[in-house]
Regions:
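Long, aromatic- and glycine/proline-rich binding clefts that accommodate carbohydrate-like moieties
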Residues: 307, 312, 362-415, 419, ...
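Hinge/lid segment of periplasmic solute-binding proteins
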Residues: 112-167, 225, 392
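Extracytoplasmic/periplasmic solute-binding protein
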Residues: 153-161, 166, 193-247
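Conserved N-terminal structural module of periplasmic/extracytoplasmic solute-binding proteins
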Residues: 2-117, 133, 139, 318, ...
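Extracytoplasmic/periplasmic substrate-recognition and gating elements
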Residues: 73-74, 79, 264, 270, ...
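Ligand-binding "clamshell"
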Residues: 118-126, 153-155, 302-318
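Paired acidic/hydrophobic, glycine-rich loop segments that form the ligand-binding mouth/hinge
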Residues: 106-109, 290-295
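Glycine-centered hinge/linker elements that transmit conformational signals in sensory
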Residues: 197-204, 243-274
Length: 448
């Protein structure tokens, strides 16, 4: 997720809670870098306030407050005022409505996967990359896999804050006993480098733990099956081109191959079969399983249960490195006549927040601003540093208006995949059902 059940379907129930009106309307001030709620994005002030809308409550919200405080020396005379909104459809609906009427905040946090539904419609304004460069933020500071998704018609419509990939967590004890760790104590990726090896590793983990091997929570979830499927499918090198009007250009045989593998991972023998999101978390926290397939946004939960919990990028099972992910990014809601000096202030504030990314990294998110991940301080973060390389191989949702975090598209794909994983549909039938649903989405006109 972030979006991290917080962000993220990611972003799920363990990290995002419905916010009360009071929380959305007000928060504590942080001195010169004040954090507060606001009733109106355009309320009068002396021009020193940069208003930010974001979906971060709970632990992530606290970390963003810390980032604002840490960033203050790099944005003197500026205060950041946050308004926290419920993540998901309510957040994006309110952002779209406010932007269309020119009443949005100065800056907002959006999932990168939703950009294709916003940038082409005129709801967002592009960033001034020359201005960002004045404050030390350059295109080369970001991984190609992430930065490439910020572009539309040759302009930059998002500035990435993080990458939040779908990875693997493991308990070091049974992983070591199963012979699945390297000499330096990290996960042996080669042991998971094909479907057969992955399944064999799951059996070894089950033997070593005396319980079960790998947990994956997906039942009734609106995104989990899609995350696992799309990352694996992109590892096959198969086409997934979605042109407006359709039909979808995909490799049905490779789709079926991936679905077949997914079903074997949760076949109910060495790995649990019918786990929902919360049950998968519980099975790993309680050490009923030795490994879990999960978003990095659950690091806090897992580390609270096992301070030595290990993590690694999702293994390359089908030949080509690819890790499903999304990215929290800063976007500029459209203004018909933006104040140039205030836009400069907004650019400076975002640059300052990016440079304070070490704070954000403590939650498990990979800072998108790579000068942060190259520091000695970041290298000391474990297990974060062990999966940071995932940022170089991330794949986001297809760049189409109907896809992205919290979308009906993810839910529709996940519902079909769930039927296959529960044994109610063959992999081939599931693949073809997904294609039919893809074509239905493609037949709908883009709002742009």
């Amino acid at each position: 997720m972030t979006g991290t059940p917080a962000q993220v379907g990611r972003h799920g129930p363990t990290r995002r809670r419905v916010l009360t009106t009071a929380l959305a309307a007000g928060a504590a001030a942080l001195g010169a870098g004040a954090l507060s709620g606001c009733g109106s994005a355009l309320a009068a002030d002396d021009g020193s306030t940069v208003r930010l809308w974001d979906p971060f409550s709970g632990a992530d919200g606290g970390l963003l407050n810390e980032m604002v405080a840490k960033a203050q020396p790099d944005m003197p005379g500026t205060r950041v005022e946050r308004t926290v909104l419920e993540w998901g459809t309510p957040f994006y609906t309110k952002l779209a409505m406010a932007s269309s009427g020119g009443r949005g905040p100065d800056v907002a946090v959006s999932h990168m996967s939703r950009l294709a539904g916003y940038a082409p419609t005129g709801l967002l304004d592009p960033w001034d990359t020359d201005l960002l460069a004045e404050y030390g933020i350059a295109r080369d500071d970001f991984a190609d896999a992430v930065w490439s998704r910020t572009q539309f018609d040759g302009q930059t419509y998002a500035v990435p804050l993080d990458t939040h990939p779908f990875i693997v967590f493991y308990h070091p004890g049974p992983a070591k006993k199963a012979g699945l760790l390297t000499a330096d104590g990290t996960l042996d990726a080669d042991a998971f480098s094909s479907p057969d090896r992955f399944l064999a590793a799951g059996k070894e983990l089950a033997k070593a733990s005396g319980k079960q091997g790998i947990a994956f929570g997906y039942v009734t979830d609106t995104a989990q099956c899609w995350r696992l499927f799309y990352g694996l499918y992109r590892q096959t090198g198969g086409r997934f081109e979605l042109r407006e009007g359709g039909p979808a250009e995909v490799d049905v045989d490779r789709m079926a191959e991936v679905i077949s593998f997914m079903a074997k991972v949760v076949d109910g023998t060495v790995n649990p079969k019918h786990l929902d999101y919360a049950s998968a978390i519980a099975s790993f926290v309680n050490k009923q399983t030795a490994m879990t397939l999960s978003g990095e946004w659950e690091l806090g939960t897992y580390r609270a249960a096992d301070k030595n919990v290990g993590a690694a990028p999702f293994p390359t099972v089908f030949g080509t490195p690819a890790v499903y992910a999304d990215s929290h990014s800063f976007v500029l809601p459209h203004r018909d006549h933006p104040d140039e000096e205030h836009r400069r202030r907004t650019h400076r504030a975002v640059a300052a927040l990016l440079k304070a990314g070490q704070v954000w990294a403590t939650a498990g998110h990979i800072p998108a601003y790579q000068p942060v991940t190259r520091t000695t301080a970041y290298a000391r973060l474990e297990p974060q540093a062990h999966y940071a390389q995932a940022a170089s191989h991330v794949v986001l949702d297809p760049s189409v208006w109907f896809a992205g975090a919290g979308s009906d598209f993810q839910n529709a794909m996940s519902q079909v995949l769930q039927q296959a994983l529960l044994g109610d549909m063959t992999p081939d039938r599931a693949a073809r059902a997904m294609v039919r649903r893809l074509n239905t989405f493609l037949s709908k006109p883009s709002p742009a």
